[in-house]
Regions:
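Short, charged recognition helix plus adjacent turn
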Residues: 1-4, 64, 74-86
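A short, Lys/Arg-rich alpha-helix, primarily the initiator
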Residues: 2-25
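Short basic helix-loop element that most often maps to the first helix and adjoining turn
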Residues: 17-36, 61
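Residues in the helix-turn-helix
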Residues: 32, 43, 72
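Recognition helix of helix-turn-helix/homeodomain-like DNA-binding domains
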Residues: 38-54
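Short, basic-rich loop-to-helix N-cap that marks the start of a DNA-contacting helix
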Residues: 51-64
Length: 86
């Protein structure tokens, strides 16, 4: 029987990747998100590929369109230490 590496308990995700993941989980295309936010599809693509910074104002607009808290987008790797210590 072959040996397998143990699964990672945590995966590091960039800000852009978090935008893409949440958008895709909601079944939205970049064009659909662009329509909801007024942010161009090209800019959304650049954000998702970490070519430009998300920024606070864009984070608020995108979070509203994706129905999530802006912190979910801005701090994708954040972990509540109080919960994880138990």
């Amino acid at each position: 029987m072959s040996q397998f590496r143990p699964a990672k308990k945590r995966v590091d995700v960039s800000v852009g990747e978090s935008v893409r993941i949440i958008r895709e989980l909601q079944g939205l295309s970049q064009n659909q998100l662009a329509e909801r936010t007024g942010i161009s599809q090209a800019t959304l693509s650049a954000i998702e590929n970490d070519r430009i910074r998300l920024g606070v104002e864009r984070a608020k607009v995108i979070a509203r369109a994706l129905r999530c808290h802006p912190a979910v987008l801005v701090f994708p790797g954040w972990e509540d230490r109080a919960d994880s210590a138990a």
